[in-house]
Every structure is written in structure tokens, then in C-alpha cells.
Amino acid sequence: MQLVDRLASHDEYQRLRALVEGVTLVQVIHVLDESSIDEAVELAPFVDRLLLDSGNPRLAVKELGGTGRTHDWALSARIRAATDRPLLLAGGLRVDNVGEAITTVRPFGIDVCSGVRTDGALDSDKLARFAHAVFAAA
């Protein structure tokens, strides 16, 4: 289960696990600044994976992903080094930058959406080129 926002308290993570037996919890961390590292370290013990994405939950209307923008991959690499959870990388990944993103962060996996679409629809040519770029970098 992907959690695009924080739960109200640490206890809520355990409560969710009790309510949904066998659930895998993936906490999205919106990589904004140094505080994102602290947030990831704080929440990692309560979840199974972390997904690092662009967005800004601090805005009046929260921006919780799907922006098509990259974030600072150096911060993502620091989060990877500071936590023991498998890390998924998202946020503005495209054919022309996914290799650098993988080399910099060394994530467990990646999440892509807008970077493989044309006019809002998945584009098989972009998907194929993206996959080749991923395999070349891995």
C-alpha cells in the first residue's frame, strides 16, 4: 500500500498493519530539502519500503506527486545511505535522465509515469527506450 502522505502518528502504521494482514507499506517521502532525510529516517522503521518523489506536501493544497519534476538526487542518495529499507525512486524520470538517477541513487526500483507518456497516454516507444536506459544503468 503506497502512502502518499504521512499517517497521523507512528501508532497508525501498526494499526494499519493490524487491520490489513500481510500488507506491504510503502511510504512516499517528498524530497524537498535536508528535512526529507530526517523524515525518511524517522518513518523507515514503520514501513517496508520508501518511495522518494518530487512534490510538496507543505503547500496549502498538497502536491503529492505526479509533477513530472525531478528532485535533488544527492539528497535521495543520502536517504538511501541513512536507511535500511528498499528505496524506490520517482519524480520526473525520463529516458534522458534515468541512467544518471540510477547511478547517483542506486535505488531498489524506480517509478515512472509522465516520463513515458505522450499526450497523456502511455507511449510504447518511450517505454521501450526507458527500459533500455534502465537496464544499461543497472
What is each stretch, according to the model?
Residues 8-114, 118-120, 124-138:
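Short loop-to-alpha-helix "cap/lid" segments that border enzyme active sites
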